[in-house]
Amino acid sequence: MDSINKIINFLFPLLTLYALLVFYPTYQRLKSAVSICRNLFSENVAGKVVVITGAASGIGEALAYEYGKRGAYLALVDIRGEPLFHVAALAELYGSPEVLPLVADVSKLQDCERFIRATVLHFGRLDHLVTNAGVAPLYFFADIEDVSKASPAMDINFWGSVYCTFFASPYLKKFRGRIVVIASGCGYIASPRLSFYCASKAAVIAFYETLRTEFGSDIGVTIVAPGIVDSEMSRGKFMTKDGKLVVDKELRDVQMSVLPVESAERCAKAIMRSVCRGDRYLLEPDWIGCVILLKVFCSEATEWVARWLLIARPKFPMMEALSNKILDVAHAFNSFFSFPHY
């Protein structure tokens, strides 16, 4: 077997280069033709039944309104009841024929079975599943005292998606539906303090890429990798090393610095267009793709830059990180050049 591997090691790079030179241009032309057809004959979701998890805020909320505008029936899921009912009422005002709000915890297997079953019993079908619920643990791995407190990242971000998909897939297959996976650019790009978040999103991407191969044409899978989108997370709501959700704006400033925050509405519109076209992937905004390319071809440099920007020198406080100093300069610049409005 070792000799076979040696032969493959020699031949495969040559065959790969040949394939790229000969077949890649044709492949891209075919992709362009398919993309044009998908734009011309995009899916009409009016009258279809859509389940959205994490629908009480952020991308999930904005997607509920986008689906509502297009006339879809909605089953909205979130662990927070009051904001969920508010979103459900607004989604109906936006045009959804009927909205079913369901309070549930996606990290619990029984809850996922319950809300999928309730959706199918109520509407009689299921066409789209949007797995959006997630939390963002934000701390250094070395600071953890009890590693079991890190489990919510996988329980919610990964297993929450898996559980929903397990119970929804028979119905999605029956109606040739689609799974819309809200992953993250962090699933491709490592970032200090986000080890568990990055790991959970990378697992989500790998899981659904594998499922797409298994499902074939029976169930479509669109994997979305957003950048920083206006949400509770982008406003500083993170999970601590003790497993508690807190708002820490100072930590938010260090971690996100001057990176642009995209509105949830803009992101949801891009996702909606991508879903209706039947896209396999969506990187939103587009510059996320450039960062991923830099990581692939200059991985050492991107890791060094992330550490240089986001981690303060030893024995210095967190706020001494270069990312926070850049933000301070940006604030000072804005204050200096701002003019009163009359």
Swiss-Prot record:
Keyword presence, Membrane: yes
Organism: Arabidopsis thaliana (Mouse-ear cress)
Enzyme Commission identifier(s): 1.1.1.-
Name by which UniProt lists this protein: 11-beta-hydroxysteroid dehydrogenase-like 6
A GO CC term attached to the entry: membrane
Coiled-coil intervals: none
Gene name in the database record: HSD6
Keyword Membrane: yes
Residues bound to substrate: 184
